[in-house]
Design a protein with these regions (language model features):
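Catalytic cores of enzyme domains
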Residues: 119, 125-346
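Iron-sulfur (Fe-S) cluster-binding modules
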Residues: 1-133, 158, 327, 331-347
Length: 347
């Protein structure tokens, strides 16, 4: 497929990465809505204001459920591993806000050297890529939708953000939507969360405030932050498309007031062009949740948007977090010489 893109094409660089103008309420995210307790005041209030999603959400609640023994792709070992990881992640989530406060004295920091140290340290610890950006309003959810502070407004407390990715194993993801893919997914949610938490703790030791944004405790939209930090481009499936691994990564973010050097990210328009023509993820999506048409203006930005209700309903029906789009994306192929050559040709 990549060889087709060696043919010169005038429109290849006409597609630009756009950014949203509006902030998103975390309570509107389907993974937050699933936590609403039927019959509770919060449940009644939400669906009174959003009746358009009530029917689909009720259908999803009636489905087997994620990681359930009655699920279509149930596998005792891999499901238990995923649930074990989720349990640890939930406990790590308590450390996001219940952490040692910053040291009283701020260390003198050279922004460029601090960034270099962070990148080397995290890469040695297992990160695939690390990037830095200024924290923007559109990076943040407007209100919290999960946890004890659900419904609380989210303000911009920090000036900078550090995004990191970790690789999901190619062989494990090739089995998607089988149980081993959800096991790998949770493995890397945990790994990215550990890296973000220890980075936030390190920054506090230097006397600067920092917050880790990990699975179940996001105040930021990680793909947007990672794209602005130069780690990739947001593609057709709504995920971060990294240069070497495509969407086969998990992301975590640390927001902070630690002075950091960053450069304005230059979007890779060739990736957008590839997504514009390829459409493989849309064709293989078992729930037809990925659009196969052109980008549209959504929330003030020109982009593709998946049908998250359809996607999630398949999750709870199959018992895994699917991953078919990730496993079939041509950019997800192993990072070897042949596929690096194909990616070079696409550019």
């Amino acid at each position: 497929l990549g060889l087709v893109f060696f043919i010169p094409y005038k429109g290849a660089r006409s597609l630009a990465q756009d950014r949203p103008k509006n902030r998103i309420h975390d309570a509107d995210v389907v993974l937050s809505r699933r936590l609403l307790v039927p019959g509770s005041d919060a449940f009644k209030s939400y669906y009174k204001n959003h009746p358009e999603v009530l029917e689909t959400d009720v259908q999803s609640r009636r489905a087997t459920g994620g990681l359930d023994q009655l699920a279509r792709y149930y596998h005792a070992g891999s499901y238990a591993a995923a649930l074990a990881n989720q349990n640890v992640i939930d406990h790590l989530g308590t450390l996001v806000y219940d952490f040692k406060p910053p040291s009283k004295k701020e260390a003198k920091v050279n922004p460029e050297k601090a960034g270099g140290f962070i990148r080397q340290w995290l890469t040695r610890s297992g990160a695939h890529s690390v990037g830095f950006t200024r924290l923007e309003d559109y990076h943040l959810y407007s209100f919290k939708g999960r946890g004890p502070n659900s419904g609380s407004p989210i303000g911009k407390q920090h000036a900078y953000a550090i995004a990191l990715t970790v690789e999901m194993d190619h062989r494990m993801m090739q089995s998607a939507p089988q149980g081993s893919s959800v096991m790998e997914s949770y493995d890397q949610y945990l790994q990215s969360g550990v890296l973000a938490l220890k980075l936030a703790a390190w920054i506090r030791e230097l006397g600067y405030d920092a917050t880790a944004h990990i699975d179940g405790n996001y105040e930021v939209i990680c793909p947007l932050v990672a794209a602005d930090a130069g780690l990739g481009t947001i593609g057709r499936m709504g995920l971060l498309m990294t240069p070497r691994l495509g969407p086969r990564v998990r992301i975590a973010v640390v927001s902070t007031n630690l002075p950091l050097s960053y450069q304005q990210a230059i979007p890779d328009r060739t990736t957008l062009h590839f997504c514009h023509l390829c459409k493989k993820c849309a064709r293989v999506c078992p729930s037809s949740a990925i659009p196969d048409g052109n980008r549209k203006i959504i929330d003030g930005a020109q982009r593709w948007q998946i049908d998250s209700e359809r996607c999630y309903h398949y999750w709870v029906s199959s018992g895994t977090d699917c991953g078919r789009c990730i496993s079939t994306c041509p950019y997800s192929h192993p990072d070897n010489g042949f596929h690096r050559f194909i990616r070079w040709g696409i550019k």
